[in-house]
Structures are given as structure tokens and as C-alpha cells.
């Protein structure tokens, strides 16, 4: 079980007038003067209270071969705590590591998140975890190969599947090293106004690829 508090302040620096329009500029332009987005742009404080439950049965934290790491997190951002607007973010995370032999591991992660209330635009990109808040759907920690923070909304669904093969163990200068080859598929989506459970598997943004990693011992 975990509990804590945090404080975040966000500022904006305007782009030069001759700069290319950003995605945010395009959204504001399409919303018009009566839209809700322009009112949430100036920046400010987002101070929060957080509680959660964590279940961790991994055999080791790095290079996990088997086990489960699941989280249920609730983050309240109340106005009485000094925030510019009040809202609640809840997040469900389930990570499972399935051994397929001594050197092969199937790793899966599912994240479902929703924001209830009027969160400012700059807070909608946050994906909360018990360890560290991440930013956005898109980028090396969510949808690999897609630009960071590319998709933003109140509701979020993400699924990562990765097959990892510990291909070789060797040593350099007396230090134990290993090489891991992997292939992955990442898929997910957002909803502007909140989760729609019946649409989890429609209009998905998908990326796939592979990689190579080198590790030292069992800790790095």
C-alpha cells in the first residue's frame, strides 16, 4: 500500500509568431472562443494526493523472468490543495512475465486510465505509476516509434507485448555481461472525454519492432 502528496507547476513559453503551428494551436483553433481548452492553457499548480495498492511477485526487478507487478492508483487534484482546477485520475496497471524456457520470456503490460473532472490540457498527458509519472501515449516508454505525447485525452488504454530472449552470457574485464534480443508490439488509444469500454479494440494506434540490450550482472 502507498500514499503520498506531490506538487507540480507548469509554465508555457509562447512560440515566435512565424513558427509552424503546433498540434495544440490547431486544437484551440478548431475549438473556437467557446471551447473549453483555451481556458486551461495559462499554466499553474497541479498539487495532488495519491493512494494505491501494489502487488509485486517478480523474481527480480531488472531482467524479470517470471512474476506479476500490478497497481491500482488514485490521484486526487483538489482545488483546496492549491490546484488551478479539481479532478481525479485513476489508473490500473498489470504487468505479467511468463517464462517460456530458461532464456525466453513473454512480457505483457496493460494500462487503463481515466480522468474525471476538468483537468487542464497539460495534465492530460500524464500516465501515473507507483514509481514515477510518465508522459504521454507515444514515445519510448509507451508506443515506441511514435512521437512522444502524440495522443492525449482523458481516457487511455495501452497494451505492450514483448518477447525477450537472453541470447548470450559473457564477461569483459572480469565483469559478467549478457545480451538480450527482443521483439515487441505496442498498441493503444485515447478518448478525449473519458474511457469508452466498448471501444478498447477499435481505432488503435500500433507500433512494432525489435531491439538488442546489454546488461551487467542481474542489476543493470
What are the functions of these language-model segments?
Residues 68-220:
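C-terminal transmembrane beta-barrel domains of outer membrane proteins
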Residues 1-104, 184-186, 190-193:
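Transmembrane beta-strand segments of outer-membrane beta-barrel domains in Gram-negative
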Amino acid at each position: 500500500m502507498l500514499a503520498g502528496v506531490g506538487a507540480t507547476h507548469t509554465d508555457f513559453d509562447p512560440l515566435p509568431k512565424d513558427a509552424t503551428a503546433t498540434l495544440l494551436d490547431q486544437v484551440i483553433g478548431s475549438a473556437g472562443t467557446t471551447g473549453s481548452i483555451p481556458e486551461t492553457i495559462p499554466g499553474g499548480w497541479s498539487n495532488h494526493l495519491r493512494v494505491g495498492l501494489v502487488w509485486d511477485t517478480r523474481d527480480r526487478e531488472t531482467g524479470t523472468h517470471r512474476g506479476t507487478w500490478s497497481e491500482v492508483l488514485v490521484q486526487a487534484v483538489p482545488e483546496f490543495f492549491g490546484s488551478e482546477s479539481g479532478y481525479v485520475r485513476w489508473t490500473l496497471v498489470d504487468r505479467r512475465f511468463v517464462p517460456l524456457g530458461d532464456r525466453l520470456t513473454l512480457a505483457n503490460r496493460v494500462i487503463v486510465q481515466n480522468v474525471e473532472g476538468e483537468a487542464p490540457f497539460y495534465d492530460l498527458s500524464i500516465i501515473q505509476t507507483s514509481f514515477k509519472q510518465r508522459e504521454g501515449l507515444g514515445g519510448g516508454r509507451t508506443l515506441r516509434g511514435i512521437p512522444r505525447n502524440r495522443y492525449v485525452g482523458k481516457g487511455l488504454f495501452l497494451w505492450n507485448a514483448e518477447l525477450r530472449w537472453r541470447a548470450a552470457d559473457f564477461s569483459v574485464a572480469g565483469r559478467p555481461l549478457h545480451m538480450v534480443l527482443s521483439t515487441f508490439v505496442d498498441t493503444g488509444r485515447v478518448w478525449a472525454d473519458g474511457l469508452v469500454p466498448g471501444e478498447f479494440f477499435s481505432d488503435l494506434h500500433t507500433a512494432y519492432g525489435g531491439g538488442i540490450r546489454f546488461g551487467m550482472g542481474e542489476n543493470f
